[in-house]
Amino acid sequence: MHTGKISEIAYKRSVLKKICDKSDNLQVGIDGAHMAIEDVTMVISSNCILKWFLGCERYYLQKTLNDIYASGGSPKYVQLQINIPDDFEEKQLGRIIRSFDEAVTEMGLSIQKCDVYAGNVSQVLIQIHVIGVSEKTFSLKDIKENTDIVMAGTIAIGATSIITSLYESKLRERFHDTFVDGCLKISEFTNIKKITDVAKEQNILYMHHVSDGGVFAAAWEMASAVNLGIEVDIKKIPVWQETIEIAEVFDYNPYMTDGTGAVLI
């Protein structure tokens, strides 16, 4: 399998079909699982670090928080589960934890639980869990035929941010420093909270965070979840010039790669 979230077809075939008691939270296109506890509805989401680069702790934390925002929630609780190789240096572990703590603190939260295990793994494995309180719940069942879907944000912000971080020196050989510096700052646009805060005040039916697989995958997931087709006007999908330039250098389709920072509404 390719690196990243598995395909919608593989998820249905090898995950959903193997689970007997199917919760509504297990559907394709669900960003966060809702759980009602008396008069409070909690929303839960998780993510794992798939690529290591400068600032990856902050980036993957933001992806997880975005799932909570898109689910109509407000994050309250952050938990980390970390698996490290037996010979992993304690100083390296400390740097990772410090990076997470700085990112969490900057976002107005705190790490409430952190488990670290040393074992037979070849690299560090980190799972990020976030629990929030749902301020407004949405249901895929409300999506009917002829429903309009709009995208807030711009495509492939996540991919542009990651690739620039990984290949900064190579890009500086090809582009002016000002351009590369701008691409590095694109990570500042991965937070969708302002978008979802505005959307929640409107009469919307559903929100879906564009993430792994890009805007095409996100649109397909929404359509597949409600068993409907979808028509996309590609000319109306916002894309920045920085994204186009980076995609051309590394020969990938910006419509089909990490779109963290955009939301389908």
Where are the model-predicted features located?
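Helix-biased detector of long, well-ordered alpha-helical tracts
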Residues: 1-264
